[in-house]
């Protein structure tokens, strides 16, 4: 049987260039920072476009990865400018986008099919509203599941 599991990646939030540098100094393989206007960490994100470009260049020069987070549930007003706002970020060549909204994921897949997308821990789906297999957004990486399950563990059969 062939394993599809990759080696674990130590991923840390950047928030600032200083924090990014600390994360790498202490062993992080990758960092993430939010895209301005499209990230839930608006208050903890000092990354404007200039700092994103610098952070991506520094990370990749060290053989590290830099992911840009796009994890909002957008209002229609933000949808109108999303691809235009994303274009300069894509030109910076981040290693992947971390996304949560299925509609935005499908939009990126349609217009930027080669851009790697990792699924955010904020992503969710209501079972009866899941897209069909042919319309399902695809992601190249999935986060470990955050789950508190109501089932009691069962004892292994002896």
Predicted features along the sequence, with ranges:
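Non-catalytic helical/linker scaffolds that mediate oligomerization, partner binding
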Residues: 1-158
């Amino acid at each position: 049987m062939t394993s599809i599991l990759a080696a674990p990646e130590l991923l840390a939030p950047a928030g600032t260039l200083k924090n990014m540098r600390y994360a790498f100094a202490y062993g992080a393989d990758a960092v993430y920072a939010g895209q301005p206007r499209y990230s839930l960490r608006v208050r903890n994100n000092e990354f404007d476009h200039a700092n994103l470009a610098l952070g991506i260049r520094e990370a990749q020069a060290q053989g590290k990865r830099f992911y840009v987070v796009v994890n909002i549930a957008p209002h229609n007003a933000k949808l109108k400018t999303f691809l235009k706002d994303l274009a300069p970020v894509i030109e910076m060549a981040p290693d992947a986008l971390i996304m949560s909204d299925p509609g935005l994921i499908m939009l990126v897949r349609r217009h930027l099919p080669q851009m790697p997308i990792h699924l955010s821990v904020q992503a969710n789906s209501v079972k009866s509203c899941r897209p069909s297999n042919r319309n399902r957004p695809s992601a190249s990486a999935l986060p470990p599941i955050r789950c508190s399950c109501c089932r009691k563990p069962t004892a292994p059969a002896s």
